[in-house]
Amino acid sequence: MNILVLNCGSSSVKFRLIHTYFDLIRENKDYSIASGLIERVGSEGLLSFRSTNAQGEVLSTLRTTAPVRTHQAAIDQIIKWITSENSGIQGIQSLEDIHAVGHRVVHGGEKLTRSVLIDDSVVEQIEDCIELAPLHNPQNLKGIYAAKKTFGPNIPQVAVFDTAFHHTLPDHAYLYALPYQIYRRHRIRRYGFHGLSHRYVRFRYRTILGMERENVNIISLHLGNGCSACAIKNGNSIDTSMGMTPLEGLVMGTRAGDVDPAILTYLAHKEGHSLDDLDKLLNSQSGLLGISGLTNDMRELIEESLENDDRRAKLALEIFAYRIKKYVGAYLSAMNGADAIIFTGGIGENADFIRQKICAGMNWCGIEIDENLNKQTTRGREGRISPDGNKPEVWVIPTNEELVIARDTYRCVMRKE
């Protein structure tokens, strides 16, 4: 089965075309046929595509610009290239050769707690969650609307939710200490995000060690421009750092993470900030960017810190690592210990300097990393970076959210659910 995976943002569309079926899933041999990104949707789009064979060898690449005014136009560009001879993809000549479409949807609320075939009722429920994820769900829906128009009713579409992995959180972990009737009226609670990434890490870790899902006890750290920690006990998410929105928790590229909420009322009175001003402050002007005053790019901050001895760059890195360290310690307590700490995401997979900083001084609970293994495990490499015999182990596992979406899409289509 050839499955097109779509991840639609406000001004971008990411895609991956994955070939899979039951035996391939069972043996972990499903593979990517093509992948790419269209940036600057809404204007002159920048297209970056490539195709690969089952061995991962690149067959063809395309990097060009084209008018891409809408998400519909972006998906049309993707289909045009995939089905063209120039793509080098064997066996994909028309829409009929794409058997299903899987969509990443950020927020499923309390009702959409598993991946589902998309029908009118599911679309309505995703629309109902827009107020919970106003920056993300509308863009995800644009992809669904566009794919429905392109493929018609005969090609099944599946919604795979970032929040679904965290539906196992107990109520004492997901409820805020606000009047309970506020939760009843508005469903204000912790939902958690990065679920596809944390779920892949759980799958990959247990596959490497040959263990059953219910025996997995890990802390997963997804560190990128957005960051979250997840406590996974007996195979289930029991706590996670992001909350009702992706703003809560760890320090991120431009997001503040945990903040005393009284600061907002103070700023509103003191500086006359509106609600929109405060939202922009917390989501777009804070985090690594806000502290450093330079950038939200971790690579640049590390360079400024090490080569130019920039004080605020150093401070940003210290605050970033310290916040993560606090969450790891809290989750170790909540879980009564863990078997492994796992780094994933762009920063988690590549920034050995940050991994070292996070783990430094945690030998009191057994967390140590091997300096050589840590430096070697970057650029897509997977492996344990802690010394032999140490518990908890420390691992780096590159995430693969698209594979999770493709496999769920396959299962939903085959089970017709």
UniProtKB/Swiss-Prot annotation:
GO molecular function: acetate kinase activity; ATP binding; magnesium ion binding
Annotated catalysed reactions: acetate + ATP = acetyl phosphate + ADP
The keyword Protein transport is annotated on this UniProt entry: no
GO biological processes: acetate metabolic process; acetyl-CoA biosynthetic process
Pfam families: Acetate_kinase (PF00871)
Protein residues bound to substrate: 104
Pathway(s) where this gene product acts: Metabolic intermediate biosynthesis; acetyl-CoA biosynthesis; acetyl-CoA from acetate: step 1/2
Recorded GO CC terms: cytoplasm
Note describing how the cofactor binds: Mg(2+). Can also accept Mn(2+).
Top-rank taxon, per record: Bacteria
SUPFAM superfamilies found in the cross-reference section: Actin-like ATPase domain
Descriptive protein name: Acetate kinase
UniProt source species: Chloroherpeton thalassium (strain ATCC 35110 / GB-78)
Gene: ackA
